């Protein structure tokens, strides 16, 4: 129903997130929700070549999860007509302890205009067998977005900062608001900034244009600096009637460039990416 801290899959990729285990929900009051989840098996974007796998300890030498360790989640969310404040945490023996907060506030400007602010905070600490003497064992991220909504669409600005990058097979830190198909926002000491506009041609058809810049480092050694810039363009069409009602078509193209002086990948990297997804939304009651 909304973005539940740590439990909700946040990847912008065409792959879904799948959890196998048990999920619990309790509406403590009309304004307070409690969520709990125990997960034994999972499928994330990092598992695209292997499929659904056991939760556990990642072995970087073999690329497999050698030891099975279930992961437990707990989250709470308070909301009213214009706000939602959520906090969640997870515990996984020999892997990590994580905490995430999501704050959302909408301010009506007049009957047709609103201003919405969103702020995400995240902290993770590796535990037990996942700790590494040569790499950072903890990280923090802060990211936010401000959106001005109008009858014709919206204008938004977003930013994010990641202290330390981590292997996505262990801890997913690619969760900030700035979005690019090409440029990496998930690197050491990485800042990312984006401005964009969504223009609604019809109630069903929307165009998006959003340039982005990034600044960070290639690794925890901080010996190769990354300076990136890119432009994202997209279109979205939602079927509102007929037998395909609820189907959503999304097409995006992205052009980016990075300066990485001294990198083994090259001093100048050029990217061109295209993404298309067809999604059908429905609800079982």
Predicted regions and their residues:
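Transmembrane beta-strands of outer-membrane beta-barrel pores
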Residues: 1-5, 38-42, 80, 89-93, ...
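Outer membrane beta-barrel
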Residues: 1-50, 78-79, 157, 161
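Outer-membrane beta-barrel translocator domains and adjoining extracellular loop/strand segments
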Residues: 6-14, 46-53, 98-102, 126-138, ...
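Residues that define the transmembrane beta-barrel architecture of outer-membrane proteins
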Residues: 16-20, 68-72, 95-99, 136-142, ...
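Short, flexible helix-coil linker/hinge segments at the edges of structured domains or between repeats
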Residues: 35-71
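Outer-membrane beta-barrel "beta-signal"
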Residues: 73-74, 233-239, 270-285
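A C-terminal functional module that forms or caps the active site or interfaces directly
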Residues: 191, 198, 206-240, 246-250
């Amino acid at each position: 129903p909304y973005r539940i801290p740590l439990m909700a899959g946040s990847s912008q990729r065409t792959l879904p997130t799948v959890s196998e285990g048990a999920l619990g929900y309790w509406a403590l009051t009309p304004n307070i929700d409690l969520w709990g989840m125990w997960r034994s098996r999972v499928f994330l974007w990092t598992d695209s070549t292997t499929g659904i796998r056991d939760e556990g300890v990642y072995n970087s030498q073999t690329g497999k999860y050698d030891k099975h360790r279930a992961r437990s989640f707990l989250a709470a969310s308070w909301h009213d007509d214009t706000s939602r404040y959520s906090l969640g945490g997870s515990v996984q023996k020999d892997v990590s302890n994580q905490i995430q907060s999501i704050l959302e506030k909408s301010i009506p400007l007049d009957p047709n205009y609103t201003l919405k602010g969103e702020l995400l905070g995240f902290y993770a600490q590796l535990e037990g067998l996942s700790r590494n003497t040569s790499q950072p064992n903890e990280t923090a991220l802060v990211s936010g977005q401000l959106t001005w909504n109008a009858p014709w669409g919206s204008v938004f600005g977003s930013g994010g900062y990641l202290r330390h990058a981590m292997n996505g097979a262990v801890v997913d830190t690619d969760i900030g608001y700035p979005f690019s198909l090409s440029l990496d926002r998930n690197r050491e000491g990485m800042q990312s900034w984006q401005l964009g506009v969504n223009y609604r041609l019809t109630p069903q058809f929307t165009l998006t244009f959003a340039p982005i810049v990034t600044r960070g480092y290639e690794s925890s050694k901080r010996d190769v600096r990354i300076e990136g810039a890119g432009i994202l363009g997209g279109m979205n069409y939602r079927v509102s009637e007929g037998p395909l009602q609820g189907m959503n078509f999304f097409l995006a193209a992205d052009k980016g460039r990075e300066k990485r002086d001294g990198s083994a990948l090259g001093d100048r990297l050029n990217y061109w990416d295209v993404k298309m997804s067809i999604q059908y939304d429905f609800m079982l009651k």
